[in-house]
Amino acid sequence: MPGPQGAGGAPAMNLGKLSPVGWVSSSQGKKRLTADMISPPLGDFRHTMHVGRGGDVFGDTSFLSNHGGGSGSTHRSPRGFLAKKLQLVRRVGAPPRRMASPPAPSPAPPAISPIIKNAISLPQLNQAAYDSLVVGKLSFDRSPASSTDGHSAYGLDSGFCTISRLPRPEKPRDRDRDSSFPAEPELRRSDSLLSFRLDLDLGPSLLTELLGAMSLSEGSAAETPAPAPAASPPASVANPPAPASSPSLRGRCPNGVTTRLGPVAEARASVVGEGPRAPADEGPGKHRGAVSGGSQSRHHYTEVDARAEGLGALSQARASWGSLDEEWGASQAGSRTPVPSTVQANTFEFADAEEDDEVKV
């Protein structure tokens, strides 16, 4: 079984130093500690074991117990590891000691300890692994320029590495500092939300439509043209249907039949005898105007116009029917339906009032 130094021509390790008996019995076995044998402070890292470059081992070395191809037991004490090495020394034989001559200086140790190099439980940290880690920040400590052989005693070459941690008070500060930058855009976003207005157009309301219909009815009543004068009988004779189509004779036909203006207007329409009785109808109109009060006061102008239109239509009807009697003859006059010579002005007045009341409701 090869020694701990391997069979690659490396200088043989003095296994006598591994025995605590050799340290006590040999006066020259005492070895001074040097700077390269003690690691520098590593922060939170606990220095629980030490493996020197010359083979000095102390501390918890249980992770090295299965090194060397032994049994598969993973839990071995350092004493068992040292006892195994002592048995190997007894079999091979220890080199003779030279008591007279001073001890020769030990050869230069290798750059990387073979025990640490071949330890399978130690992680190998490199720059690629550092880039992939997010939780912690890894940094490798280089050895100071104390070694004279040009090789660093610690660091990547010696296998020692340091996982440095940020102090706990610094982490919240960094978070607060990082979180303070996006605070300004958030305030801007809130200002834009406060200045945002939502305007919805739901169309015209029912009240707007009612007011529009009432204004149209009032405008049409005010824009009604004045009736033609009664002193134009030739024009009415030349064109007999003109009185029926005129807006002043709304609701009447040449044969004397009155069109339906509504249930109320139809019930109030009646046929009266000849003779101007328009002044007799002014009483009911005035009475209805007095009863209606302020709601019918705005229709006063419409009622006056209706009365004037009724008087004008009466004169035109007399002239038109007189000319028709002369043209058609006595035979046609006998079969013709009697036509009233008087038009009640209040009929149109009540019809307009009822239409306005229906719009108001």
UniProtKB/Swiss-Prot annotation:
Sequence repeats lie at residues 220-226, 229-235, 236-242, 243-249. Disulfide bonds: none annotated. InterPro entries: Cdc42_effect-like, Cdc42_Effector_BORG/CEP, CRIB_dom. Residues 332-347 have a biased composition (Polar residues). Residues 167-186 have a biased composition (Basic and acidic residues). GO terms for cellular component: cytoplasm; cytoskeleton; endomembrane system; plasma membrane. The modification Phosphothreonine is found at T34. It is a peripheral membrane protein. Residues 220-249 are annotated as: 4 X 7 AA tandem repeats of [PT]-[AT]-A-[ENT]-[PT]-[PTS]-[AG]. Keywords: Cell shape, Cytoplasm, Cytoskeleton, Membrane, Methylation, Phosphoprotein, Repeat. Interacts with RHOQ and CDC42, in a GTP-dependent manner. Belongs to the BORG/CEP family. Probably involved in the organization of the actin cytoskeleton. Induced membrane extensions in fibroblasts. The CRIB domain mediates interaction with CDC42. This is Cdc42 effector protein 1.
